[in-house]
Amino acid sequence: MLAKRIIPCLDVKSGIVVKGVQFRNHEIVGGILSLAKRYTQEGADELVFYDIEASSNNRLIKKKWVSQIAEIINIPFCVAGGIQTIQDVQSILSSGADKISINSPAISDPYLISRIADRFGVQCVVVGIDSWFNKEESQYYVYQYTGDNTKTIKTSWKTCDWVQKVQALGAGEIVLNVMNQDGMKNGYDLVQLKKIRKICNVPLIASGGAGDYFHFYDVFNEAKVDGALAASVFHNRIIKINQLKKFLMKKGLEIRVC
């Protein structure tokens, strides 16, 4: 059995790590490098770095940020932000990333997933999916350009359909960002994650809602995800990664020892 992954996330806006609630009202958290170093020292299994404005502004994440982080960490490093071409991927990987994540660009050009997978391998391609639960329709939909709420749009894709589509195109991993839960700290959306787990045959990462130790245990134990991504609880030191891992190990989960 593969060890469950604990993954801190750095959402970056204008060169500073920020965090919002339901993808809105972002507040400054801290510096990119100091947080990256701290999470490595605390025992994170992977680091995810999102330039949340890049796709909305039709630009690529700054390579200098990628290379600076890569120099000070020794864990797998996933990068996202405005990646639209094979050349963009090559540039980011050459700067020190281990894999890339695409979200909004994949919605505009789904076969970008296939082109990247064919060139670099499926293990290099993560697809991020921003999912919002529409109460009126009792349905989950995929949203695009969520890094800027003035440009965010609801797509015609139902989340379950998009999950199946990106797998068919070559996604090697899926990060499901549950927008309703983002920053709320009241737990991951286990209902949606269980549904997605049934149709997801690649590693599935849960994102959005972590607030305490049991939220991590529940998402691993009940939704059977492969990794849990979080930001607020780590940034604000509500939870320290090494202590979280000890808790999960005592609960019987397979966890990489720090």
Curated annotation (Swiss-Prot):
GO molecular function, one term: lyase activity
Pathway stated in the Swiss-Prot or TrEMBL entry: Amino-acid biosynthesis; L-histidine biosynthesis; L-histidine from 5-phospho-alpha-D-ribose 1-diphosphate: step 5/9
EC class name: lyase
GO biological process, any: L-histidine biosynthetic process
The EC number(s) this enzyme carries: 4.3.2.10
CDD domains reported in the protein's UniProt record: HisF
Family: Belongs to the HisA/HisF family.
Protein's name according to its UniProt entry: Imidazole glycerol phosphate synthase subunit HisF
Name of the gene this protein is made from: hisF
Cell compartment(s), UniProt: Cytoplasm
InterPro entries noted in UniProt: Aldolase_TIM (IPR013785), His_biosynth (IPR006062), HisF (IPR004651), IGPS_HisA/HisF (IPR050064), RibuloseP-bd_barrel (IPR011060)
Subunit structure: Heterodimer of HisH and HisF.
Catalysis: reaction(s): 5-[(5-phospho-1-deoxy-D-ribulos-1-ylimino)methylamino]-1-(5-phospho-beta-D-ribosyl)imidazole-4-carboxamide + L-glutamine = D-erythro-1-(imidazol-4-yl)glycerol 3-phosphate + 5-amino-1-(5-phospho-beta-D-ribosyl)imidazole-4-carboxamide + L-glutamate + H(+)
